[in-house]
Design a protein with these regions (language model features):
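Short glycine-rich phosphate-binding loop at a beta-alpha junction
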Residues: 29-38, 106-111
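Phosphate/pyrophosphate-binding loops at sites that engage ATP/ADP/AMP, CoA/4′-phosphopantetheine
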Residues: 18-31
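Glycine-rich phosphate-binding/hydrolytic loop that grips phosphoryl groups
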Residues: 67-101, 108-135
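Conserved ATP-binding module of the ATP-grasp superfamily
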Residues: 12-18
Length: 135
């Protein structure tokens, strides 16, 4: 699938330009990693059961359009989203899609751990290493 950057998206064009500018220094494939509640919820709504926890950009487009087709109230009542999530999930999907399109990234990895959890795990692992080496 050919992925093109949509400069007319709702995402700030300066952010998209920054992403595009970074591409010249990257060789090889580009991978997207999404953390947090919005991408996790989009992944769950997609109904995918995938051991790799990845979602193709085409699937993200579909689930984004699906969620966007509901009103705020329907997102809360029919999709069972929390009120704070129902309010921001559509713009969040637009941001993920715009960033992936500009980076020409075909899929996004949706880990079970959030960014905060991953940083805490990393710090704890480093602490254990220091403690181990000091004994």
């Amino acid at each position: 699938e050919i992925i093109k950057c949509d400069w007319s998206s709702d995402v700030c064009s300066s952010d998209l330009r920054w992403i595009s500018a970074q591409l010249s220094s990257i060789t090889g494939p580009i991978y997207a990693v999404g953390t947090g509640g919005n991408i996790a919820k989009l992944y769950n709504i997609s109904g995918q059961v995938d051991e790799t926890k990845t979602m193709e950009i085409s699937e993200l487009r579909k689930v984004s359009a699906y969620v966007k087709s509901f009103t705020y109230e329907e997102r809360v009542n029919k999709l069972r989203l929390n009120t704070d999530r129902a309010d921001v999930i559509v713009p969040a999907a637009s941001i993920y899609l715009a960033a992936m399109e500009c980076a020409q990234c075909p899929s996004i990895f949706v880990p079970d751990l959030g960014l905060k959890d991953g940083i805490i795990q990393l710090l704890y692992d480093r602490y254990l290493q220091r403690k181990k080496s000091s004994n």
